[in-house]
Amino acid sequence: MVTNSETDVVKVLKDDGLKDIDWATLEKYQNATTTNLDDFRDEFGRWTSWAVRIAYNDFFGGVLINQLSGKGNRKHYHPDADENWVILDGEWEWWIEGQGTKKVFQNDIIVVPKGVPHLITCVKGPGARYAITKPDVNHVYV
């Protein structure tokens, strides 16, 4: 049963526990040619939750998300786009409908097809993941 739908990435991130996120922070490094996780952690903190949008164009958006143990997102799906992640740090649990819960680690790549509910939790942090999907993707919460 659909309970909520959202395309505003700042609202999505705030509701997922990144309370200090705002548009200025999210877009500060948007479409920068080269970025580095350690540089972001020096600026925003290793032991805090934050997000920055690295890529944004007509075809895809990419958001780097740093979260602490026990943090993650709400169960949701994207009705019109697949979503991909690259794990940069930490240990995560990915629940994917029809596949159950999987543990993922640094250098793992995860793909969830459109329409498939999923839930992400950092279990050993700080954890960093790079999420890639269509720009302004619709999140439908279940």
Named regions from a protein language model:
Residues 1-60, 74-75:
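A short, N-terminal "cap"/entry segment at the start of jelly-roll beta-barrel domains
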Residues 69-71, 80-81, 100, 116-117, ...:
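A generic "binding-loop/recognition-motif" signal
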Residues 98-115:
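Short acidic-glycine-tyrosine-enriched beta hairpin
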Residues 47, 63-79, 114:
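Conserved short histidine dyad/triad with adjacent acidic residue
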Residues 2-22, 59-61, 65, 119-142:
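Double-stranded beta-helix
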Residues 65-68, 77-94, 133-135:
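Short, conserved beta-strand element in jelly-roll/cupin
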